[in-house]
């Protein structure tokens, strides 16, 4: 079994060694320009145009990340980038859900326990106990109710926060109030104190966190963007922060990455930044998922996490 591999930064030797443990008869081959030899599967991240074009012999393509927007967005320019009829799969929960829960929970608690406010008091050498927030007044709204969004929402619900989610279609999540579709977005936003974004990147969700949406949040709201930078209109967030509508923001993703040095987000006192590290692909978990998926395909089954190219996720 031959498996093509392309990632601009991952070390193929580590992936090859891990794959041997799960699929001893598989051979991982680093794709190089001009490599047109046959292969059974492909593992890719930001693949060059010539890598996959015309490879209709592939049984499946695995994108080495939870999102596939960077791949699908190129189809408008290169319609033949992906070979016709070959299923595409994504890494949906290869350790990413646990990482995302850790990140989201830590930040919600940071705001809930008013650590930003206490840090400001410390800079002024002021000893001043503040009125504590109540869980009932700290409504959390999660945009996106897939595997990542759903698990984040349920984790926060178990901690006593009132939690709601909004997605394309209604989802039944224990302890979470569900909203769906454009007609229910306003109701979802009403009263939301903490907005967590875990939406997929599709044409419908680009720029969704804009001035109109931010204005519909509760006063002194908080914004946590963990999905994609294109979801957020950064200028609108800065304006909402300066007006006091939004009290604080934690951003892991940006319209342009790396975030340019001149971006005002770097220097805003109520914005915290991390460099797209909320949930990363861990080789051990990713290889185990890929091996299980390949085993299922070889048996004639369809693994989970197949991408609907038309929907974009």
Curated annotation (Swiss-Prot):
GO molecular function: glyoxylate reductase (NADPH) activity; hydroxypyruvate reductase (NADH) activity; hydroxypyruvate reductase (NADPH) activity; NAD binding
GO cellular component, as recorded: cytoplasm
InterPro entries: D-isomer_DH_CS, D-isomer_DH_NAD-bd, GhrA_Enterobacterales, NAD(P)-bd_dom_sf
Lineage top rank: taxon: Bacteria
Keyword Electron transport: no
Compartment(s) where it occurs, according to its Swiss-Prot or TrEMBL record: Cytoplasm
PROSITE patterns listed in its UniProt record: D_2_HYDROXYACID_DH_3
Active site positions, chain numbering: 228, 276 (proton donor)
Cited Gene3D superfamilies: NAD(P)-binding Rossmann-like Domain
CDD domains (UniProt xref): GDH_like_2 (cd12164)
Sorted UniProt keywords: Cytoplasm, NAD, NADP, Oxidoreductase
HAMAP family assigned to the protein according to its UniProt record, in alphabetical order: 2_Hacid_dh_C_GhrA
Entry similarity comment: Belongs to the D-isomer specific 2-hydroxyacid dehydrogenase family. GhrA subfamily.
Free-text function comment from the UniProt entry: Catalyzes the NADPH-dependent reduction of glyoxylate and hydroxypyruvate into glycolate and glycerate, respectively.
PANTHER family: 2-HACID_DH_C DOMAIN-CONTAINING PROTEIN, D-ISOMER SPECIFIC 2-HYDROXYACID DEHYDROGENASE NAD-BINDING DOMAIN-CONTAINING PROTEIN
Protein name per UniProt: Glyoxylate/hydroxypyruvate reductase A
